[in-house]
């Protein structure tokens, strides 16, 4: 299945942060490790199978299966790089460039997600996303 993590602003508008699909994982890293309430929400966008683990159980596995600890560190670093790149793109890229980056990062989700979800991730309206898609399709 597919998930989204999102926050809701003061006006009640939802803003998607990342998506996660089959074989991926998604969680509020700050909330999980600091054991504090989450500032974000996670929603399944499709029928999904969820595997969850308690913090103490994950820490136990880290201590007792060193290879697992290394795998989680590598995955966490990869997710951090993705988030860092997204921040850089939001600051310095056009909406079309951000959409092309989305297609590269989430190639299997572009046809599975509604325009509203993708537009929220890109920080644009669904109508503007449709315009971008038309421009790309026409080769402009």
Enumerate the language-model features and the residues they cover.
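A short, polar/charged loop-to-alpha-helix boundary motif
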Residues: 14-17, 135
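Cyclic-nucleotide recognition modules
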Residues: 16-74
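Glycine- and acidic-residue-biased ligand/ion/polar-headgroup-sensing regions
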Residues: 1-6, 11, 22-23
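Alpha-helical bundle regulatory/interaction domains
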Residues: 64, 68, 72-83, 91-92, ...
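Phosphate-/nucleic-acid-contacting segments
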Residues: 93-140
